[in-house]
UniProtKB/Swiss-Prot annotation:
It comes from Brugia malayi. Residues 1-19 form the signal peptide. The keyword Transmembrane helix does not apply. GO terms for molecular function: cysteine-type endopeptidase inhibitor activity. This is Cystatin cpi-1. SMART domains: CY. Keywords: Disulfide bond, Protease inhibitor, Signal, Thiol protease inhibitor.
Length: 127
């Protein structure tokens, strides 16, 4: 009787440790993955809200991408963005339709995106 209880206890401890490790580890994604591209494009609105530059930035490409399962999905992205000729604050302005201002340098951003669609949550943080 003693042996099965010990065995089950050991299995429980191992499974909890393994589950925690899976939950806390990050997975590397291909930068061209469709999901990653969609998240990066959607994140640009909040990136533009958080920058001090007077014009909008436009996503050029995703440089690197990792994900982590938390209470939702956390995306760790490094993106390259280019300044555009479109001013911030213009009603209905879509940076994807703006012209890149080639006289200004591109900028690399490291961002964290927390997405929990069932809670209607999509939060972007510049790091």
């Amino acid at each position: 009787m003693f042996f099965p209880i010990v065995w089950l206890s050991v299995l429980l401890i191992i499974s909890k440790s393994f589950a925690r490790e899976i939950r806390l580890s990050r997975a590397t994604y291909n930068e061209d993955d469709e999901e990653i591209q969609e998240v990066a494009e959607k994140a640009m609105e909040q990136v533009n809200d958080q920058t001090r530059y007077r014009n909008l930035y436009k996503l050029v490409r995703v440089i690197s991408a990792q994900t982590q399962v938390v209470a939702g999905i956390k995306y760790y992205l490094t993106i390259l963005a280019a300044p555009t000729t479109c001013r911030k604050g213009a009603v209905g302005m879509n940076p994807m339709k703006c012209t890149i201002d080639s006289s200004k340098p591109t900028k690399q951003f490291k961002i964290e995106v927390w997405s929990a669609p069932w809670q209607n949550t999509f939060k972007v943080t510049l790091t």
